[in-house]
């Protein structure tokens, strides 16, 4: 197997006397779909927050290839190609659909203040590329006809897809999805399943997924990590996890 794209070793996160994440280890290899699951309150989102710079871990290492991420600000981690969605949709609600995708690309535009003020050819070219990229992703998720609609007026499922597209216009290596199927109906969940598979298969994106929809998780994941009360419980293929007695007990509330 190739070198891990992301390696997490001994991750710890303490809030006062509460140990929210306790010695979590995980690896992501290029173009994998890996899920992080566990009962409510298991520490999954806290792990995401550590990986993406929202929290500074109390201990452990996070390596993107050979670059340490622990303690870096979220914006810098995003520029390095690690982006995320959230449990609750976080769009610029007063902006239009396409403006949300253009704003997301602002940090990727390799033009300085001088170029922007003078509208130099390089600035105009970068702006045109950003607009083309935004339109391409809106077409892919079926929202191109709503490009000029205010984001807050979209249906909930459309807002979820827009949030993923907002990540993808930045051309990330790793996309972390925090409960993307929450609140979706069965048809929307199936479309999400297909979209995640396409991101991996056709856009070379590595996916780390937190999700409570076990049908989605078991159907799409290459590997699964399980945490309970902040502590690693198991990891393996979907079949191995499905038949793991410790995992079964945790989900039945016996662990």
Curated annotation (Swiss-Prot):
Annotated ATP binding sites: 38-45
Protein origin, superkingdom: Bacteria
UniProt domain ABC transporter: residue ranges: 6-254
Molecular function GO terms recorded: ATP binding; ATP hydrolysis activity; branched-chain amino acid transmembrane transporter activity; L-isoleucine transmembrane transporter activity; L-leucine transmembrane transporter activity; L-phenylalanine transmembrane transporter activity; L-valine transmembrane transporter activity
A single BP term in Gene Ontology: phenylalanine transport
GO cellular component: a single term: ATP-binding cassette (ABC) transporter complex, substrate-binding subunit-containing
Entries under InterPro entries matching the protein: AAA+_ATPase, ABC_AA/LPS_Transport, ABC_transporter-like_ATP-bd, ABC_transporter-like_CS, BCA_ABC_TP_C, P-loop_NTPase
SUPFAM superfamilies for this protein: P-loop containing nucleoside triphosphate hydrolases
Swiss-Prot/TrEMBL keywords: Amino-acid transport, ATP-binding, Nucleotide-binding, Transport
PANTHER family: CONSERVED COMPONENT OF ABC TRANSPORTER FOR NATURAL AMINO ACIDS-RELATED, HIGH-AFFINITY BRANCHED-CHAIN AMINO ACID TRANSPORT ATP-BINDING PROTEIN LIVG
Function: Component of the leucine-specific transport system.
Homology family: Belongs to the ABC transporter superfamily.
NCBIfam families tied to this protein: PRK11300.1
Protein name in UniProt: High-affinity branched-chain amino acid transport ATP-binding protein LivG
């Amino acid at each position: 197997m190739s070198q891990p794209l992301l390696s997490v070793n001994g991750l710890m996160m303490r809030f006062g006397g509460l140990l929210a994440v306790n010695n979590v280890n995980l690896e992501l290899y290029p173009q994998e779909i890996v899920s992080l699951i566990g009962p409510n309150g298991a520490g999954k989102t806290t792990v995401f927050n550590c990986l993406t710079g929202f929290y500074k871990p109390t201990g452990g290492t996070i390596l993107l290839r050979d670059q340490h991420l622990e303690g870096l600000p979220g914006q810098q981690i995003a520029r390095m190609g690690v982006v995320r969605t959230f449990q609750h949709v976080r769009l610029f609600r007063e902006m239009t659909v396409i403006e949300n995708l253009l704003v997301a690309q602002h940090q990727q535009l390799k033009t300085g203040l001088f170029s922007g003020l003078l509208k130099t050819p390089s600035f105009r070219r970068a702006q045109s590329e950003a607009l083309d990229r935004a339109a391409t992703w809106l077409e892919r998720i079926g929202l191109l006809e709503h490009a000029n609609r205010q984001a807050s007026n979209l249906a909930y499922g459309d807002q979820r897809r827009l949030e993923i597209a907002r990540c993808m216009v930045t051309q990330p290596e790793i996309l972390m999805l925090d409960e993307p199927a929450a609140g979706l109906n069965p048809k929307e969940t199936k479309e999400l399943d297909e979209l995640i598979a396409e991101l991996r298969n056709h856009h070379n994106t590595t996916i780390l997924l937190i999700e409570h929809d076990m049908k989605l998780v078991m159907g799409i994941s290459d590997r699964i990590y399980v945490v309970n009360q902040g502590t690693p419980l198991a990891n393996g293929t979907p079949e191995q996890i499905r038949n793991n007695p410790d995992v079964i007990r945790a989900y039945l509330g016996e662990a």
